Amino acid sequence: MTQQAPLIDGYEVVIGIEIHCQLNTDSKIFSNAPTVFGQEPNTQATIVDLGFPGVLPVLNAGVIERALKFGMGVNAKLGTYNTFDRKNYFYPDLPKGYQITQMANPIVGEGYIDILVNAGQKDEYTKRIGITRAHLEEDAGKSVHDAVPQMTGVDLNRAGTPLIEIVSEPDMRSVDEAVAYVKTIHELVTWLGISDAIMAEGSFRADINVSVHKPNTPFGTRCELKNLNSFRFIHRAIKSEIERQIDVIEDGGKVVQATRLYDPERDETRAMRTKEEANDYRYFPDPDLLPVIISDETLAKVRADMPELPSVRKERFVNEFGLTAYDANVLNGSRELSDYFLQVLDIIGKNNAKIAANWVMGELSGSLNKNELTIDQSPISAKRLAGLIVRILDDTISGKIAKEVFGHLWESDKSADEIITEKGLKQETDTGAIEAIIVDVLANNQAMVDEYKGGKEKAFNGLVGQVMKASRGKANPAQVNALLKQMIGA
């Protein structure tokens, strides 16, 4: 289901996004310098990265494969004839005075990706966002303002790191759609294994183009919000810029096209410079790099190495396993989590997908988050979690006892069966034993019995709780409910 984004103070919002995603090759796009983050400044740059006279770039073949994977992941036309261009501008962290990019013949052409907006909420909907293009380029260095008092340093470790710049169509009409789009692209590049996409390290950052206009009027003047590297900042920056542009127009002014920065402390955007157009960069073909022709054999090899896409797997989780779109979205938040869930399902059967989803998204994910661990670092393997769920399904233990067993699984290498046996946690299903407990509970809680007989349903829940407490949580809840009603009514 799709839906029309609401107006904001009577204005329609138009948003397009450019994402700069570093590719996770071991060396840079045109040199053999390493790409390890966090090293001492200027220790990972060769003379190629530094722009020494006479040096020649050599293309890293790994970036081609990764870019093709992305193109296939967004259903795009793939550029089999690739050229590189020079984007000319001056900035201290750009040692050559130009950036090598792809202007004329990008490796990824038009495509699309479907996003889920407001996931898990009543107003949840899907929307298709067009991809204009995605092209390869080299990253710039980094200006460092806090290393030396009253001076700015330049760290060129990042210069030459391979990037894929992903340009969307201006198809987003709300803050929520924009954030959902960025999250979906982030999920895809990590799923494909082409980028670590660690936003805090700058390996995945977004430039957001925002404009507003009244319905049935031409699009407004856009402003670009530069270098946003967290989902929270993206949300806040867009919201702030929308409000600013509306205020300018309502006050009788005109929005000036500009590049702006978001100040999170003041929660506002501020002008950085007037926005450049393509001709300001004087693009021309890079004479040092030959065209790259991608063969059918290369395309077939990359396609054969493609994993099942998150969008396809989400659809399978809904249609084949009967999960909600929200559950499918959460479980496919990372390829590792999704694979873990499927491993559990391989053991307990797809008919039990809902209980498996509840345990993976609930107890397991909660414990991982609490301990700041990833799913790959989980002390409980998929096989051991499946063993626990099997014992819930066959009524060996109750759901409440299962949480206790889970805690022991987290702290040890033992199986659920071993823990249940050692701790004496097996569920009590003997009717006679449960009836004996109920007799005592009824005798000691006559007032509660009278309340239930008088029509107070909550009193019955209290009696159930007393029975479960007396059995130390071991009594089968379904049996307790049935026997209680039978014995109270007798």
From Swiss-Prot:
Pfam families: GatB_N (PF02934), GatB_Yqey (PF02637). InterPro entries: Asn/Gln-tRNA_amidoTrfase_suB/E, Asn/Gln-tRNA_Trfase_suB/E_cat, Asn/Gln_amidotransferase, Asn/Gln_tRNA_amidoTrase-B-like, GatB, GatB_C_1, GatB_Yqey_C_2, Gln-tRNA_amidoTrfase_suB_CS. Its EC number is 6.3.5.-. The keyword RNA-binding does not apply. One of its GO terms (biological process) is glutaminyl-tRNAGln biosynthesis via transamidation. The keyword Ligase applies. Disulfide bonds: none annotated. Keywords: ATP-binding, Ligase, Nucleotide-binding, Protein biosynthesis. GO terms for molecular function: asparaginyl-tRNA synthase (glutamine-hydrolyzing) activity; ATP binding; glutaminyl-tRNA synthase (glutamine-hydrolyzing) activity. It catalyses: L-glutamyl-tRNA(Gln) + L-glutamine + ATP + H2O = L-glutaminyl-tRNA(Gln) + L-glutamate + ADP + phosphate + H(+); L-aspartyl-tRNA(Asn) + L-glutamine + ATP + H2O = L-asparaginyl-tRNA(Asn) + L-glutamate + ADP + phosphate + 2 H(+). Belongs to the GatB/GatE family. GatB subfamily. NCBIfam families: gatB, PRK05477.1-2, PRK05477.1-4, PRK05477.1-5. HAMAP family: GatB. Allows the formation of correctly charged Asn-tRNA(Asn) or Gln-tRNA(Gln) through the transamidation of misacylated Asp-tRNA(Asn) or Glu-tRNA(Gln) in organisms which lack either or both of asparaginyl-tRNA or glutaminyl-tRNA synthetases. The reaction takes place in the presence of glutamine and ATP through an activated phospho-Asp-tRNA(Asn) or phospho-Glu-tRNA(Gln). Heterotrimer of A, B and C subunits. This is Aspartyl/glutamyl-tRNA(Asn/Gln) amidotransferase subunit B. The lineage of its organism: Bacteria, Pseudomonadati, Pseudomonadota, Gammaproteobacteria, Moraxellales.
